[in-house]
Amino acid sequence: MKYATGTDNAMTSGISGQTNNSNSASNEMQPTTSTPTAVHKEATSTATTTATYANGNPNPSANPSQSQPSNALFCEQVTTVTNLFEKWNDCERTVVMYALLKRLRYPSLKFLQYSIDSNLTQNLGTSQTNLSSVVIDINANNPVYLQNLLNAYKTFQPCDLLDAMSSSSSDKDSMPCYGSDFQITTSAQCDERKLYARKEDILHEVLNMLPLLKPGNEEAKLIYLTLIPVAVKDTMQQIVPTELVQQIFSYLLIHPAITSEDRRSLNIWLRHLEDHIQAAAAGLTNRSYFLQPSPQLVAGGSSTGSGSCSSSATSSSTASCSSVASSSLCPASGSRSSRTNDWQTIAPPSKQLQNKLAGDWRGSGGGSSSGSINPLCDNLNGITLNELASSQNSLGLSLEGSSSLVNGVVAGAGSMLGIGGGDDHDTSFSKNGTEILDFDPVTADMGEACSLASSSLCGRNGGNTVEDRSQPPPNLQQQLLQPPPYASILMGNVGDQFGEINRWSLDSKIAALKTRRSNSLTTQTISSCSSSSNSSVITVNDNCSNSTENLAQFANKPRSFSLSIEHQRGALMNSGSDTRLDEFKPNYIKFHTRNVGMSGIGLWLKSLRLHKYIELFKNMTYEEMLLITEDFLQSVGVTKGASHKLALCIDKLKERANILNRVEQELLTGQMELSTAVEELTNIVLTPMKPLESPGPPEENIGLRFLKVIDIVTNTLQQDPYAVQDDETLGVLMWILDRSIHNEAFMNHASQLKDLKFKLSKMKISMVPKMHHVKPAGVGPNNGNINKPRWNGKTRKCDTKSGSNDRINNRKNSNDMLNFSLNCLPHPLPHHSQQAPPPLPQFDYNGYGGGPSHQPQYKSSSYPSFMGNPQQQPPPPPSSKSHHHPQQMQQMLQQHNHFPALPQQTPPQSHRRSLNNLILVAGGPQQPQQLIFKPGQGVLTNNGSNDNLGLERNQQPQQQQQRKLSGGVSSAEQQPKKTMAAVVMENLAKFDQHFTLF
């Protein structure tokens, strides 16, 4: 039914279809209304008027310029809805109220709760049937009573009737039924109608008790679910009315006691029932109580887009499109009724079979059938699918693009029939080339409840009004009576291709349709409902009941990419690697489980290169894992090589206690090296272990023994002076500690392990690196200083072209003026001990050196020559005690003679580095000079140093004489022994007096 916003077309789309106004409808229903109902109607009328004045514009689509008051328009709408509500049965009213309650806010819901409690109290106090209501409430939750009722329903079958009629005995054998107050007797004189009526009475009683089922009563719920397959079978055999079974389905699909797994089991039976309803509506059966097409429904359905909401219009249009495509491609739909249905092969819904159901056929067939046959449920679908949120699951779905009830139609029939329902439907393509239905099961089931309730209403009213209405056009009637495409595809193709529907047996193994390799980390329950040439529709189910079902599912899983988490299709097609080990991350395969000691099973399998079999251990306990054998692994589909390797590794897990005990004893006695013990710990740290606090014998506590061995190894490294502290051993031990910190078995000891790891890290840092040799004290230019062992003059590059032994500076940010060469200092030369050192060159302020002009120069001015001509170097000063102070002063002045002088004419040259060009030296003597500044060159300043320079000139002849007198003394005794650090500090102290850097 389409809810209309105006009053003109409100009644044209109603159930009766007659042109009755609100007053006549109100008067028509008045005799059947009791006095309390009239009081409530009066109160409702007053509340309606008050709400109208409070709301200035109750109808946004109405024209503000209309003369009719807005309160009158709202009152008429309320009256219309009330009249329609009065014409519905109890199941339809319950479904509508359930759908409308989902659209209310919390204050309104609390108000209705208080009102309902008050109404229940008044009815129990004033009603004459309060005792019977209490009895029904008790029986509805009594498993014994319900089981007797179910046994009574199952007792009478058509075969029993034929046997009773063929018998010649005239005695009456009565069989009591404990589920109700009546007696069911089977005799030769009982006819078919009486048997059908008695079964129908049992279904009526179940229909009255089902709403009173309390959530949490699992035994009673299981009996209600067990009745469904038998009732559907009787409906197919035309024994009980279809509308009764539909109403039972409506209650079950919205009942808070029914879980999502129960709804999945119900959806299979619901598809068969809808297929039978469509076949009956098409005229294939001639039972009077089956669903018949109603002309007023066709008239109401023709005005779909006039006053309905957008979601309902979209739903009906998409469903009609699917019906047209289905009718054009499947004209011989009547042949489906001739197939044999072996209903006994499908087990009744139970907790053990909920995870093995063949597919998740939900939310599609009922929605499409209701949209094409009865437009009553279209608006109810819009109500339920807009803001529904039950206490069990969230039912909120957006109504963008297409209604959610036809998303299953688009998903199932889109690839086979070429129907597209929109770009934003709830069907997503997986990375393996198959389709995954990811719509909300509870929302779809809510739509099923709406369709079932409305269909039962049509079945009740269709026979009364069919004589007074003209038949719709043939093409429109054929379109409306076409079976739902989704159910026909899933059911018809199976019947046409495989013969009988017993191939849907839930007890047999579910065949896996292998398309492309799927992710082994994705738990999938794959069901095949069509041939391999068509696209399969699979549902992702992560709720596995036990490990046996996991193994059964694993046996049928296709070969998979081991660790591909999320990849695009192009990456999967172009990749040449099957294992994708480079993308492995530890958190990808670390799943949360309730089984103690099994959270790290993924890392252990990864270390064995068997991580693709992680699904075997998802819901397996620690004890069950240790009992796995090679034969068992091969029986569930593991390859021969992998099963053999995994079985050997599991056998090694049982030997861990003995290995750790042996390592502990040998470490205490000194018979085992630390490297061997660390290697044993490496093999055990990734294995699954129970926490230390787990109950059990101490000899089986692997975690406790593991910590004991770690404690012995670390104490030996820290305290034993004879222990070999190997850098590699320390690194492996720190890795073991890091793995242990994140292990489930040592979660309560993580802080202690972290402290131990920190101590080992400090020990590792304090160890001398292997690659650097420590020189003894007094040897080399550093005099045994190991603070900077890497930087010495021998390991640096030297200038081989100019014949100099100076180091070449290769740093980009180096400053040539700060790199003081050790050649400026007098060094001992054993092989030239009898020769006096050459004199140092004299500086000239004009840039002219004291030596010859052919002094070797670097190609770049950024590399000035720090080595003067050996013939121009002055001899070392004599080592006389009387001249100790003058010699020290002279030496300090001579330390600056190694700086280069400015050349006369230097052609422009290319420099490799530009940072040296930023160094400029300002100042100079007060006399006028003509200097050509080149990049990387410096000029001495006279900032208070003229006196020192003059003193240096005056002392030059004296130095010459002193060097001649001390020629016979060895050079080794004359040279002062200074370290490089002392020379650098002295140069830096005098640097500010001679240079100014910009």
Curated annotation (Swiss-Prot):
| InterPro entries tied to this protein | ARM-type_fold (IPR016024), PHAT_dom (IPR015327), PHAT_dom_sf (IPR037093), SAM (IPR001660), SAM/pointed_sf (IPR013761), SMAUG/VTS1_RNA-bind (IPR050897), Smaug_SAM (IPR037634)
The cross-references to Pfam families, in alphabetical order and at most eight, read: PHAT (PF09246), SAM_1 (PF00536)
GO MF assignments: mRNA binding; translation repressor activity
Annotated region Interaction with cup: the residues are: 583-763
> Per the database record, which ranges form the SAM domain?
600-654
Asked if the keyword Transit peptide belongs to this entry, the reply reads no
Q: Where is this region: Disordered?
A: 1-45, 50-69, 329-370, 773-892, 942-977
Where in the cell is the protein located? Cytoplasm
Polar residues composition bias: residue spans = 1-37, 801-822, 854-864
For biological process, the GO terms are: negative regulation of translation; nuclear-transcribed mRNA poly(A) tail shortening; regulation of DNA-templated transcription
Gene3D superfamilies given for it?
A: Smaug, PHAT domain, Transcription Factor, Ets-1
Feature: compositional bias, Low complexity: 329-338
Provide GO CC annotations from the record: cytoplasm; P-body
Which domain of life does the protein's organism represent?
Eukaryota
Q: Which UniProt keywords apply?
A: Cytoplasm, Developmental protein, Phosphoprotein, Repressor, RNA-binding, Translation regulation
Give residues where Phosphoserine occurs.
Answer: 564, 575, 971
UniProt family annotation = Belongs to the SMAUG family.
Q: What does this protein do?
A: Translation regulator that binds to the 3'-UTR of specific mRNAs such as nanos (nos) and prevent their translation. Prevents translation of unlocalized nos in the bulk cytoplasm via the recruitment of cup.
Free-text domain note: The SAM domain mediates the association with the 3'-UTR of specific mRNAs.
Quaternary structure, from the entry: Interacts with oskar (osk). Binds to the 3'-UTR of nos. Interacts with cup, which in turn recruits eIF4-E, leading to an indirect interaction between smg and eIF4-E that prevents mRNA translation.
Q: What is this protein called?
A: Protein Smaug
Q: Which organism is it from?
A: Drosophila simulans
